Amino acid sequence: MGFCVVVNVIAFPDRQIAGDKQTAKSGILAALDIGSSKISCMIGELRGPRARGQSDLRSNLRVVGFGQTASRGIKSGAVVDVAEAECAIRLAVDAAERSAQISIHSITVALSGGRPATATHTGHVMTQTGIVGPRDVEAALMRALGHADTQGRPILHLHPVNHALDNVTGIGRPLGLHGAELQADVGITTVDHAYLRNIALAVGRAHLEPSNFVLASYAAGKSALTADERALGSVVIEIGGSVTSLAFIRHDKLVAAESFNMGGQLLTNDVAHGLSTSIAHAERMKTLFGTAIEGGHDEREMLAVPLLGEKGTDSVQHVAKGFLTRILVARLEEIFEHCAKRLASPAFAQSAGTRVVLTGGGSLMPGLAEFAARVLNRTVRVGFSTALNGMSEHQRHAGFTVLSGALLHAARPDPHYALPEKAWNALAEARMGYARRLGRWLAEAL
């Protein structure tokens, strides 16, 4: 399977992606979250029109199927054993199909790895008539894309993040406004070429076609952020099993994104090593007794810890809860210091002072929001999955924000995202009409 990496490969809303027509007509949608600790699938049914408002979309979307299995063949969000990954994907999707009593053929895939990188490029044009028209917006966007060097990395998301007209900035919809010079600032998010190919390979071997892809932290924001947070700007920090991802979202658009290979599994490994116990017992200790803030009674509260490889009455040691907390805090400080470095980078410069929302299974630890607020020097809260119709109470915690957000993305994807190979080939055959379709896309998107 080959992947196109030219800058101007963009999906248009008036062009149906191959293999997705049947599900689109029936209103059946599916999302897949390929994580390092678990692989989850959610099937939804869109009842009613794909309204423009997020609240309307949420009320019209109902979850009808769910499946989850332990991750296999995945390390740090990337495929390391395609046969094992295929098997795990099949198990999760099969469970979701059985619960929904529906067979699916295409799916939206959330991506947590691939070293996402964002850059903003600017294009300037003089308006043709003194009033901004679709061709002017198209020309400004093409100028901006002309400055982009993706270095062979496929574009995952592309957003016009800002417009300026005669040096008046902050314009969301420039069409129809009077002005001489139009500026378009375009945000581009790319991922590693081989990473995306291997994810698509594993999904394809499970007899599914990726209808589109979405960055995991961006999907989490679609689910966990409030309307005001999405509009005013917020940073999502998605703490997964092996990967922590950051996304700055403003005006419902992805402005910046990054990730690094540290997550909840590293905390579990630290506990196992520090307490000389098994991974399974370490995970249990972390889940039941882990906290990010030391309490006054932690040194007096003793925990029974089974020793690794020991049996009998002498196989249990007793340690103070405070010792467990110190193990966790040491690693949490490292994780959030990495986050702070990335938030201080030029890519996230516009996010200064905005709220941080923690998502992912790793964000459920008591006291983590307060701990993160101290390290990041920002207001922090834990975000929970949006309450879609048909979701169980178990699926509404922070560990399912990516999956539910990917389902929302499937219901109304951005008009520009990474494409499967068939759609690339179809676009390549119609390159002569590219500018005309791009103009129509801009009229709808802006």
Feature map (PLM): residue ranges:
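Feature representing long, continuous alpha-helical segments
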Residues: 269, 322, 326, 330-337, ...
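Glycine-rich beta-strand-to-loop/alpha-helix junction loops that act as flexible
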Residues: 109-114, 240, 354-364
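Glycine-rich phosphate-binding loop of actin/hexokinase-like ATP-binding domains
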Residues: 232-274
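Small/polar loops that bind or transfer phosphate-bearing groups
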Residues: 33, 191, 238, 259, ...
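Short glycine/serine/threonine-rich phosphate/pyrophosphate-binding segments
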Residues: 39, 221-222, 232, 241-247, ...
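Nucleotide/phosphate-binding catalytic cleft detector across ATP-hydrolyzing
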Residues: 1-235, 254, 264, 278-325, ...
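Nucleotide-binding motor/catalytic cores of P-loop/tubulin-like NTPases across gene-expression machines
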Residues: 253-256, 350, 358-408
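Short, charged, surface-exposed secondary-structure boundary motifs
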Residues: 79, 269-270, 389-394
